[in-house]
Every structure is written in structure tokens, then in C-alpha cells.
């Protein structure tokens, strides 16, 4: 007998499956997710924990007319399987395959593109309001994880949704990793009662009665508070009720039959409602359920039988691990140093700092804006905070970087993990913009280490600097260099990484870890008789204009390389320096290599670097073209 899952090519097919068979379908979906994530990596735990919610939603609502908006998208693997992408699911997070997150261009069932947290409620409210304006039929549901509820924008959306009173359904998928629910016999009893027609009919009848009494609105408000008072005492819903939502729950988020029944009732409810569903992250897969730290949050390839990562050949440590070790050394030597992250203790490596220095390591939740201003407050009182956040997520705190830190010249260090191209996580997670959006901030020192030692030196330098500083480093392994004791670098001074005797044909200025590819390109060019010098600028701001302009002027041709956006980035900084020094008027030939004006999709990092033209082959080709073009025109 074949799988139920193989009969489902759309939500319409799912609706034909009897409710009694849905638990078996959920098990098949779990098995498919586990097998695929073992091969491709991905957000296993969140998706396993939300299978029943996915199935019940699609069984009751009618996507794409009804809009299902997934916060972050970690929970949406089952959604992809149920919406015509079953066969393509094996390609998820691979080159040319499905994205790891919902994307509007991928399917009409992906109502909103996501990847960053806490946005679903605001987006869903916009959709339901658009339906009101246009008269288009359909329901809108936002599915939000409890972790996303630590983000302020989620409550901004709740606040307006409650005020407007639209028929918005918010499903809070609480996997007990952030929120501690108030559960028990009374809570369970109230959950059933508050979702029932009887309870809501009673509320409506009381209201209708009071409206016939003079000064009814005031009386209604008094009685409404009385009705809700007992409920608020025994459920965690008081906050949501206070924001204008009708609260239902907690309910068992793995009881798919019960969820179908509840969604059927809530689909006809008038007004904003929040359903609180308790789930288990990693549900149905013991290795994920038993991982108390992350429960299979974001995994690379793993062995299905054990849940353990598939070991690749031994190599250099990841930059993330090296940063964490260097930070712990700094914290050990200087009690003023503290570490801050936004719900990414594991991802940024700060779990090591938390274990060694629990009272000086802060996880503020998905609250990047708060993290930066919290750091600013600490810095005001003599503390040396290090804010470790993925490059893509620090974008959310840009105003705080400028207004709360840089404007006041506070000594806050920003450690930007995942700077540059990130691989399988794709468009929403690329760290492409940091060099551009940071280098324009007055007084902010911006550093890009080319190897592990440079990372250690730059962290140490930032903590000795009396002002704001940022260092960005990539995802993945380091270069494998022997580690040196950390030392203070002279701010604004780069180094000549490769010199040649006499007059060079071309100079390559390579920011950060693009230095390795630049050196490889220079060696390949040397074999062809093309002499190339290579500069490691170290600092994107302040730029070492003396060194860079001197080497560019010596060669008369220069290629800049960065793993960041070309618009406003490191290459632009060099162009500005060349302009100031009169090198452009003197005929300097310039080529800039970096990420073009587009969002780079998911693939292996090496392939992405080849796509955008910053690998060794592309750098060598750019140098050849520049040298050949100049010689063809008779320019020395």
C-alpha cells in the first residue's frame, strides 16, 4: 500500500483525506523531512514540531485564497510538501532547488517571503486589511513561533491588529523553548470552553442584553472585564487579551484531529484571535527531541540513525569557533568585557562564553535593536560590550548603531558573523550589505580579517579602541594558520601581502577572506608572466589610502575584491580614495569585483563566489583583461 503523502499534490487533495487518517499522514511527512534534512541540512526541529499545525491548517483553510503566513519559515517544510512541491522537496536548499524558506516566486501558496523573525503578524494584518479594502474573500492566518514573540515587531503587529479588530487568526506555535506556558487541569478546561460555540454565544447574548440598558457601552466594558478576569488568572492569555485578541489555549499542537476541530471553529470567529498551541521541537525524532540546546534547529548533513553530524575530512576550525575562543580569552583577561547576542548563542559561538562567564553573557532574544542599545547603555558605564550577531540580522538595528552608539562615540564592538555569502540559507541570509551600510557611519571603525590571526588581532584591537568598531568574518572554516597571541593593530593600516620586484603589471586589493583567492590568482598570473602585487587592507574604514594608492599608482592598474555588495562597498571606498588622490585623472585603470546588484540565491558557497566573480579564476581573468586592455591601448 502506497503512502498517503504520495496522493497529495495540492491542499485540495489533502481535504479529501479523512480526519482519522491524518495522524498517519503526519508520520509520513515527518519521515520525509528527516530523510531530506539528513542529506541537505536544514531547520529540522522546527519543521518536525509544526507538522500537525501545517496539516490541520491546510485541511481547514483553502490556500492560496486563504493566506497562510509563516514567521521565519523554519516551520514550513510540511507546508511545501502539501502544496505541490513533494517531488521537488528533495532539492531543498540545493543549487537550482527549492529555497529553505517560503518565497512568493516559488509558489502561489507562499503568501509572504520570510527568513527573518517576527514579521508574520504585521504582514498578515496587511493582507487582511487589503482584503477588506478590495472586497476579496478569504481568511488570513499567521503562524508564529514562540521565539519570534521575543521580537518587538511581533507585538507592534499585535497591537495594531487588536486595535483594528480584523478577523485575523494568529497561531502561536509554542515549542517551550522560549515561553513557559501556564498549563494544568483548569487551563485545559478553559481552553476547551473558550473555543466552543456555547461560550461565544453566551458572550454575545450578554453583550446584546447590556446594549438594551442605558449607558450600555460602559456596562459592557465592566462585564467584559469580569468575564475575562477568571480566565486571565488561570491562562497565559492575559497579555493577548489586553492587546485586543480573543485568546484560545493552550491546546495540544500534536493532536491533529483536535486542531482541525479548533480551526473549523476559529475560521468563523468574528475578530482577532490567537490560538496558543503547545508543541515539541523535533517531535517524532528522538535525537532532535533530546538535544536540549537546539533540538535540531539548524543542522548540516547528519546520520538518521544517530542524529549525529556526518563528519567531513578534518580541516581548520570555523571562524565562529575561533571568534568564540578569542572572546573568551578577552573576557578572562578583562572583567569589563561582556558578550551579547540576539537568540543566537549557538550560532555565534557565544554558548562557550555563556558556559564560562554566565553572568557576563546575555541572550536578549530576537531583539537586535534592544541588543545594540543595551550595549550602548553598558558602554556608558565603563563596560566593553561585544555584540555578536549574524550580518544579515544586524541590519535590523541600523538606527541604533548610528543614533545610540556611533553618535555618542561609545566603545561597542560589533562582531558580524556570516559576513558575505552564506550558502544554502540563500537570499534572506546573505551578509552582502554590511561593509556598505557600516562604512558610511561616521567614526565607526570597520575591519575585515583575512585569516584566524587577523580575527584575533582585530577583536583585541576593538576592545582597546575608545570608540565603536565592527569586524566581519565569513561562514565556514578558517585558513588553518598557526595561531599567534592577540596584539593591537594600528587602526587604518593595511599590509602588502604579496610584492614583486620592479614595476608590477597590476595590483589586487582584496578585503577580508578574499585575500586567499587573490593570492592564488597572483600565483597563476605569475606563471603567465603577469606580475601582480596583493594588498590586504585590513581596514575598510579608515582606509589605508597611503598604501593602497601607492601600490595602485605603481602598477597603474588595480583590481579591488570584496565579498560584499559593489554598491557603496569596499571597492567604492577605494574609488573615492583614487579620486581624492588624482589617480583617476592620471589614467589609473580600475576593475571592481564583488556582489552585483541582485539577491544571490542558495547554493554552495564556492559556487556562489564563482557566480559573482570573486574566486581565484575570476580575479585572474579580471587582471588579464585589465592588463591586456591597457596594453592594447598603448598604456603602460
UniProtKB/Swiss-Prot annotation:
Signal sequence range: none
PROSITE patterns membership: TRANSKETOLASE_1
Biological processes per GO annotation: 1-deoxy-D-xylulose 5-phosphate biosynthetic process; isopentenyl diphosphate biosynthetic process, methylerythritol 4-phosphate pathway; terpenoid biosynthetic process; thiamine biosynthetic process
Gene3D superfamilies: 3.40.50.920, 3.40.50.970
Gene Ontology molecular function terms on file: 1-deoxy-D-xylulose-5-phosphate synthase activity; magnesium ion binding; thiamine pyrophosphate binding
Catalytic activities: D-glyceraldehyde 3-phosphate + pyruvate + H(+) = 1-deoxy-D-xylulose 5-phosphate + CO2
SUPFAM superfamilies: Thiamin diphosphate-binding fold (THDP-binding), TK C-terminal domain-like
Keyword Transferase assigned: yes
GO cellular component assignments: cytosol
Matching SMART domains: Transket_pyr (SM00861)
Record: residues binding thiamine diphosphate: 74, 115-117, 147-148, 175, 285, 368
Keywords (A to Z) from UniProt: Isoprene biosynthesis, Magnesium, Metal-binding, Thiamine biosynthesis, Thiamine pyrophosphate, Transferase
Subunit structure: Homodimer.
Role description: Catalyzes the acyloin condensation reaction between C atoms 2 and 3 of pyruvate and glyceraldehyde 3-phosphate to yield 1-deoxy-D-xylulose-5-phosphate (DXP).
Classification via HAMAP family: DXP_synth (MF_00315)
Family to which this protein belongs: Belongs to the transketolase family. DXPS subfamily.
Name of the featured protein: 1-deoxy-D-xylulose-5-phosphate synthase
